Amino acid sequence: MARRVLHISDCHLVAPGETLLQTDTEATLRAVLNQAVDEAAQDGCDAIIASGDLAHTPTTPVYERFLHIVSDYFNVPMLSLPGNHDVLQAMQQAGMSMAPIVWADWHLQALDSHEDDRPKSLITELDRQAAAQGLAQGAAHWVLLATHHPLVLVDCPWLDKDRIVGPLELMNWLNAASQQRLCGAVFGHAHQEVAGRVGAWPVFGVPSTCFQFRPRSPKFAIDDKGPGYQWLDLSKDGKISRTVRRVAV
């Protein structure tokens, strides 16, 4: 059967009462979830992918608050990945999990591309093996990969230096590990809508739930687009379609 997945990223949650770049990141996250849950009431939601930089103040209480906020709107499985602003140990202490979400037809698999407090992607051999072990857990027909860092250039030089190196080799390796079931990938980090391909695989970057980075900017710059998220529609024949949504705040 078809699956519908909500993809959020780069929430940058801070301590209560604080803001980041003049943005109340809890308010923008709640605005995203409030709109998304209304859409889910019509079209459904089977799971959530939260692809990193979920906290900007990366403490266990902030991650616990993130989980509480999400649970105010949704009661579905969530695949949670760390980003470069996250601290994996604090996420794990809060109960956030990179364990795969597996149905009979689709398998949502995380690949950790982060290193605590460093912007550049880092995928170690242990990260690869963890993903391979996750892929071995299920026999779903199709696999969707989730990372934090981009798998393609986003045409922002200051961001592109942090992208995943050797994406085609990586995707080929993961496809082999999944017994040729890999259908595509999603990522965060770029704070903007991205669509591209790595070899034959479609890859989709999602806007941030808070502020956006200006597309095609050679240096750090904030865009005027609103908070965003994307719906991933996973068909029973292995196709992935996505719909980007924005909220007005």
Predicted segments, located by residue:
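N-terminal active-site segment of His-dependent metallophosphoesterases
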Residues: M1-R65, V154
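Binuclear metal-dependent phosphoesterase catalytic core
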Residues: A2, L20-T23, A31, W173, ...
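Active-site-proximal beta-strand elements of phosphoester/diester hydrolases
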Residues: R3-A15, D105-E115, L144-H148, W201-P207, ...
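Acidic/histidine-rich helix-loop elements
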Residues: L6-R30, H56, V87-A94, D117-E125, ...
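Active-site glycine-centered loops adjacent to acidic/histidine catalytic or metal-binding residues
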Residues: D10, G52-D53, G83-N84, H148, ...
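Metal-dependent catalytic neighborhoods of phosphoester/phosphodiester hydrolases
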Residues: E18-T19, A50-S71, V87-S97, S121, ...
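Alpha-helical scaffolding within the catalytic cores
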Residues: A31, Q89-A99, A131, A190
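His/acidic metal-ligating clusters that form di-metal
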Residues: V32-A47, P119-F204, G238-I240
